[in-house]
C-alpha cells in the first residue's frame, strides 16, 4: 500500500482564500516540508538582538516585495504534514472524515460497487480511479469542487514555484516585517474580525509567540473552518472571491512586534494531523462561502480576512511577536463553531443583501464583533452547543438553506446579528478576557453605521400606512369625533361667508364654524343658486324620505348589507376597515346629504337616529330601568356603552336616566317647588346674558334708576338650560320643569286670563285650524309657531304646539298614519264646521260676542314675570333654603348683578 501511494500524483484542491496551490509532482512536497521544519527550528534558536538588527535593515527593502501572502502558515502546515503521512496511506480503500463530512473511496474498476452497507448516509462519497496517482487521499472533494480546483491549477503552480524559490530565513523575516507595517497602515480601516488577533504584552515590553496548541480538537476546528470557506468560495462571484483572498493573505501573514522591535516568526505546530485538519477545514469553509455569496461579497470577505490575519501586535519597545496560540480545548471548539456559522451565513444571505456589498464587504468574516455585547452572549451559547455531533451540524445547514429565502431585507449590519452570538466566540477566545480600546472604537463605529443605514434599507411598511389612512377616515367620518382635523381657515373670512346663509353663525363655537366652512359652504352655495333656504330644527317628512333614499342608494352602490353597518361601523370590528374604505372611495358625505338643505353633521345625526336598530323599542320595563341604574353606577355617563349593553340608543338611555336618576315627585306642584322653579329659571336667564348686554342695562339704570327693567320675549322660553334648572329644583326632572314653566309663563304673559277655556277655547281652536289651512305647509317643521301664537293670544310658541297636538289627537282618527296635509284637510273639512256650530250655539246662549285675541308683546317688565303669589310664602322659602335670598321682581340680588345691586335683563 505504501508503494502504491508513492506513485500517486498529488491532486490537492485548495481554497482561493489561502492560495494553497495544486501541485502535481512526486518528490518535492516531502523535501519542502523538511526544509520548512528545519528553517523554523533555526529561527527559534536565533537571538533577539540579531533579529532586531536584521529587521531594521531589511524593512525598507521588503516594502516593495510582490509577496501577497505570508508563508508562515504554509510552513507551519507543511512542517507538521510529514509525521503522519504514512499512517494515512495505510488506510484501505475506504476512509471517513467525520469533521469534513466526506467519505473518500479509493477503488479501481473492480471494486467500485463493493462499498459496505454500514457507511453513513449523510456524507458524500467520492470514487477515485486507482489509475490516477494520489499522494494525499485525505483531501478529496466532490466533482464540483475538483473542477473548481483544477481551474486554478496553473495560477497556483506559478505562485507556488515563486514562493519556493524565495524561501529562506532572510525572506521570512523580511516578509514578516513588511506585513507588520502593512497591517499598521490598514488597521484603522479593518472591520470587526480584525480583533481576533489581539496579543498580550510581556513583562519586559516584549511580546512573544505563544506555543501552538498540540491538541487534536483545536486543529480539527481550524480544519473545519477551512473546509467551510471552500464551500463559500465555490458560490461567490469572482469579485467577492478576490476580495476574500486578499483579506485571507493579510490575516495569515500577520506578524507581531515585540518589546525590543523584534519580529520573531510564528512557531508552527509539530503535530502533523492538526496541521492537515486545519488546512482542510479552512479550505472547505471557504468553498462553501463561495457557493452562497456574490462577487462583491467575496471580494470584501477576502480583503477582510487578509487584514485580520496580517494584524500585528506592538509591544512596549516596538517589537513584534507572533500571535500566541491558546492551548485550550474550548477555544479550538469555538473556532469550529465559528466556521460552521460562516457556512450557514453564506447560504442564508438573501440576494438583496448580496447586492449591497460591491467591494470590501466582509459578510462571512465581520459578523463576530458587530456588537460587543452580542458576541459575549454568543460566547456562552457556544459553550452549551460545542459538543454537538456532525450530523446535527449538517442538519442545521440544510435548514438554513431552506429558511434563507424567508428572510426579510435587513440593513447591512443586521445580517451580522443573526450569527454574532456564535461567530463572535472565536474572536473573544483569542483576544482574551480584557477588552481593548481599539475594539470599543470599532464597535462604536459599526453601531453608528448600523443606525444610519438601517432606515434606508428597511422596506416601507405598507400595511401600517393603510391602517393609518383608515383610522384617519374613521375619525373624519365619525359623528362623535372631535374637530381636531378641521381646516385652519381664517375664522373671520369663514364667518363672513357663512353669515349669508346662517345669520347667527358668529354665535356658534369656533370648531363648528370651521367644520361648516369645510363641509357645507359649497353645498350652501349650490342650494342658494337653486333658491332653497338652509333649514334647522326638526326634519320634515320630505327630508326624512330623501335621507332614506340617499342611504339606500349608497348601500346599493357600495354593496354594504345594511344601514346599521354603514352608520354604526364600530359594531362590526371585523368589517370596519372595509366599510371605511368604501365610504372614502364613494364620497359618503356627498351622497348622504344630496338634496337636503341642511348642514352635513345634522344630516348624519338624523340618519343615525332613523336607522338605529336599537331605537323605537317602546316603553322601559322595570327590569330595563334597574339595569340602566346599575350600568350607570358602573360606567357613569358613557351613554354609548350603556346603550349597547341594554340594546337601546344612546339618546334613549340618556333621556330615560334623566327621568329616573333620583327620587322625583309626581303630580301637582307644591308652592315651594313652584318658587324654586321660578328662582332657578331667573338665575339661568341672567347667567346667559353677555357682558355687552350687561353694560347696556347698567348704563340705562344709571341714567334712570327708577325705570322698570324689561326682558325680551324670546329670552323667556328660548335657550334655557333645563338641566341646570333641574339641578336647582332637585325634586323634579327637567321635562317636568319645562312643562311647568310654560304653564306659569303663559299665565303671566296673559295677565292671568284664561284664554283657552270655555268659549275662548272654541274660538282658539277655530282660529288655529283656519290659520294652519291658510299657510298650506307640507310639514310641521315648516310652521312658524311664533307667528301662529297670535291666533290664540299672547302665549309662548310651545303652548300653541301643545294645543295643536291635543287637537289632532282628539279630532283626527288614525292621525299617526296620515301626513300633515291630510291632517289639516281633515280638520278643516270635518272638524272645523262642527266647532263653528258649537261656538255659535254657546254665543247665542250667553249673549256675548267673540273677543279678539290680544296682540303678542315683544317686551315684558321683569317684575311682571318673576314674582311670587304670596310674600309670606317667599319668607318660608327663604328659611327652607338656609339663607338663600328669594327671587322677587323688586328684590336686589348683588351676586346675580355682579355687584350692581339691580336686576338686569
Curated annotation (Swiss-Prot):
Query: Which segments carry the region annotation Disordered?
Result: 1-33, 151-443
**Basic and acidic residues compositional bias, start-end:** 1-16, 24-33
Any idea which GO molecular function terms this record carries?
Answer: chromatin binding; DNA binding
Positions where Phosphoserine occurs in the chain: 65, 240, 403, 478, 481, 487, 872
**GO cellular component terms?**
fibrillar center; nucleolus; nucleoplasm; nucleus
User: Looking at the record, which segments are called May be involved in interaction with ARF?
Assistant: 498-886
- Residues forming the Myb-like domain are 612-661, 661-745
Question: Where is the Glycyl lysine isopeptide (Lys-Gly) (interchain with G-Cter in SUMO2) crosslink found in the sequence?
Answer: 700
Complex and partners? Oligomer. The oligomeric structure enables to interact simultaneously with two separate DNA fragments. Interacts with BAZ2A/TIP5. Interacts with CAVIN1. Interacts (via the N-terminal region (NRD) and a C-terminal region) with CDKN2A/ARF; the interaction is direct. Interacts (via C-terminal region) with NPM1/B23.
Q: Which InterPro entries match?
A: SANT/Myb (IPR001005), TTF1-like (IPR053078)
Taxonomic placement: Eukaryota, Metazoa, Chordata, Craniata, Vertebrata
Where are the Phosphotyrosine residues found in this chain? 476
- Which residue ranges have biased composition labelled Basic residues? 163-174, 215-226, 270-283, 330-339, 385-401
**Keyword Ubl conjugation attached:** yes
Keyword Disulfide bond assigned to the entry: answer is no
Q: Where is this region: N-terminal region (NRD)?
A: 1-223
Composition bias, kind Polar residues: at what positions?
A: 410-419
Keywords (alphabetical) are:
DNA replication inhibitor, DNA-binding, Isopeptide bond, Nucleus, Phosphoprotein, Repeat, Transcription, Transcription regulation, Transcription termination, Ubl conjugation
Instruction: Output this protein's name.
Output: Transcription termination factor 1
Residue positions, PTM Phosphothreonine: 248
Its UniProt domain note says:
The N-terminal region (NRD) inhibits DNA-binding via its interaction with the C-terminal region.
Localization of this protein: Nucleus; Nucleus, Nucleolus; Nucleus, Nucleoplasm
Provide the coiled-coil residue spans. Answer: none
- Look up the record and give one Gene Ontology term from the biological process aspect: negative regulation of DNA replication
Q: Which residues cross the membrane?
A: none
